[in-house]
């Protein structure tokens, strides 16, 4: 299996190393526009294989031709969010970048699965889908996996328990309108509402919504990358190993949850064909309304990009 990572920044490079270490790909190609950066990072990763005990070939390049015949393409290219900047502020600049990147990779790979990480991820997934012409099942956004990871982390920290015992879902857009679904949150099967009062849960939900900007405010000149990379690799491994994992991912909805033709984060089954099933779970009226509001924001922002495709 060949996996290409576009963007050799913090998220892309960290994801590339994790993929190499897990050895579910024969070859990882790291591509970036800056000469020397992907080559140097790829060589450094490859040399770590003697210590970390992996044989995955890691190659760095500035040429999209080296992505030829990729099975999975991970797109992390784009501008990082800065303090005071919302994901939506990145919209026009990153949309133009993603349009160009997608056009280039599709010249050399006929039927890849594209995993989008660049923000605003729901809208960039839309751009990649529109430009690539791939079936909706093969263009997937990473948002819900990361948001769910943060939600689990905050719950575990509050209860002083293992994160491994927490089951949770965060739906909707990867932004301020995300929807942590409290009714589907449990600890070893015990509903979260039996372990924490509602005001504490509301605080955890709010912290989850602001999880990304919390890290941006600490870093000042960058954004999160360890957790985004780990979340992305969890998705890619599920696809590469055909694990049929149920994960919250950004996908194009076709009537599910009453939402049509909008990319939104919902539970899906991930396997060798990409998104193999969209799971429609029962939501409370407030949760369904919140999911619709989240989808409306994504749809509104996507309409702002029409000039990009003129």
Swiss-Prot record:
Xref: CDD domains: LDH-like_MDH (cd01339)
Binding site for NAD(+): 7-12, 32, 94, 117-119
Protein family per UniProt: Belongs to the LDH/MDH superfamily. MDH type 3 family.
Active site: 174 (proton acceptor)
Chain sites annotated for binding substrate: 81, 87, 119, 150
InterPro entries: L-lactate/malate_DH (IPR001557), Lactate/malate_DH_C (IPR022383), Lactate/malate_DH_N (IPR001236), Lactate_DH/Glyco_Ohase_4_C (IPR015955), Malate_DH_type3 (IPR011275), NAD(P)-bd_dom_sf (IPR036291)
Keyword set includes NAD: yes
Organism of provenance: Chlorobium chlorochromatii (strain CaD3)
UniProt name for this protein: Malate dehydrogenase
């Amino acid at each position: 299996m060949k996996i290409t990572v576009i963007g050799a920044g913090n998220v892309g490079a960290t994801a590339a190393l994790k993929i190499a270490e897990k050895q579910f790909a024969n070859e990882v190609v790291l591509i970036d526009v800056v000469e020397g950066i992907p080559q140097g990072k790829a060589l450094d990763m490859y040399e770590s294989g003697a210590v970390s005990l992996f044989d995955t070939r890691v190659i760095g390049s500035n040429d999209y031709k080296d992505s030829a015949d990729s099975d999975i393409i991970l797109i992390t290219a784009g501008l990082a969010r800065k303090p005071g900047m919302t994901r939506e502020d990145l919209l026009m600049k990153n949309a133009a970048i993603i349009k160009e990147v997608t056009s280039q990779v599709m010249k050399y790979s006929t039927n890849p699965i594209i995993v989008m990480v660049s923000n605003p991820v729901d809208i960039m997934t839309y751009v990649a889908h529109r430009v690539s012409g791939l079936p909706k099942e093969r263009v997937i956004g990473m948002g819900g996996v990361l948001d769910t990871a943060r939600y689990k982390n905050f719950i575990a920290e509050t209860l002083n328990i293992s994160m491994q015992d927490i089951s949770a879902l965060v739906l909707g857009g990867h932004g301020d309108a995300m929807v942590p679904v409290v009714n589907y949150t449990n600890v070893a099967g015990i509903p979260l509402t039996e372990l924490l009062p509602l005001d504490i849960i509301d605080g955890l939900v709010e912290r989850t919504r602001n999880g990304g900007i919390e890290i941006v405010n600490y870093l000042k000149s960058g954004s999160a990358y360890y957790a985004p990379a780990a979340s992305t690799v969890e998705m890619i491994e599920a696809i590469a190993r055909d694990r049929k994992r149920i994960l919250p991912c950004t996908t194009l909805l076709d009537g599910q949850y009453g939402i049509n033709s909008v990319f939104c984060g919902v539970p899906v089954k991930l396997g060798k064909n990409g998104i193999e099933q969209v799971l429609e779970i029962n939501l409370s009226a407030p949760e369904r309304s919140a999911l619709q509001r989240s989808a409306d924001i994504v749809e509104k922002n996507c309409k702002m990009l029409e000039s990009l495709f003129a």
